[in-house]
A protein has these predicted regions:
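Signature of uroporphyrinogen-III synthase
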Residues: 1-226
Length: 226
């Protein structure tokens, strides 16, 4: 029987995940729990030694990559780094992990004396990146480029037969719980990180699977196989 996999992340990344799910022989079902709403914000990079992106949504919300293409970019993971390269940034480095790994990458490759850092992200950020970097002597300017707005009603997909639901952020889990965790007891929750799995543990699932590393391919391998 073909596994039916609910994808809770927002567009446009949801479509990319759907393609990867389909490539592994499962049936993707779009079930967005968040909508990404761009915010007007200061896009100037003057005086910045580097830009920091904690999600690909932040990259998509940056309107003038060509104007800043020579500013180094530090990204939380490979998906975000790939989005930055596609947007035209020339010097892109990936922490290949979570916010803690990103903070470590900044501290080992950059100097506080070289200029400020601009962190472009959403209205909700996992962890305390600014706090860690400020404690290490860096000046960090946080720019809120988008808001992740939670769904007010459960997507229709949760009324259909499903086997697995994928969570790429704790924010998506929070939105799911706020909707009453529809069908959780019969579903496998696939979580991209331990932080997300901890949020999901607020309710009972058929099973909770955590990716061995915060990479989508690892998440799909752990939940779907193939």
């Amino acid at each position: 029987m073909t596994l039916r996999v609910a994808i809770t992340r927002a567009a446009p990344e949801a479509q990319k995940t759907a393609e990867r799910v389909r490539a592994r022989g499962a049936e993707p079902v779009l079930a967005p729990l968040l909508t990404i709403m761009p915010c007007g914000y200061d896009t100037s990079t003057e005086g910045a030694q580097a830009l920091i992106f904690t999600s690909s949504n932040g990259v998509h919300a940056f309107p003038d990559a060509r104007g800043a293409r020579n500013v180094p970019v530090l990204a939380v993971g490979e998906a975000t780094a790939a989005a930055a390269r596609e947007a035209g940034f020339a010097d892109v480095r990936s922490a290949d992990g979570d916010v803690n790994a990103l903070a470590a990458l900044v501290k080992t490759t950059l100097s506080p004396a070289a200029g400020k850092l601009i962190h472009i992200g959403g209205d909700h950020v996992a962890g305390d990146l600014s706090g860690q970097l400020s404690a290490a002597g860096f000046k960090v300017e946080r720019r809120v480029a988008y808001a992740a707005v939670a769904a007010h009603a459960a997507p229709p997909a949760f009324s259909e037969p499903l086997d697995i639901v994928l969570f790429h952020s704790a924010r998506a889990v929070e939105a799911y719980l706020a909707l009453g965790a529809p069908g959780a007891g019969r579903l496998i929750a696939g979580c991209l990180s331990p932080t997300i799995a901890k949020a999901a543990a607020e309710v009972s699932w058929k099973r909770v699977i955590t990716a061995p590393s915060p990479r989508e391919n690892d998440l799909l391998a752990a939940t779907i196989g193939g």
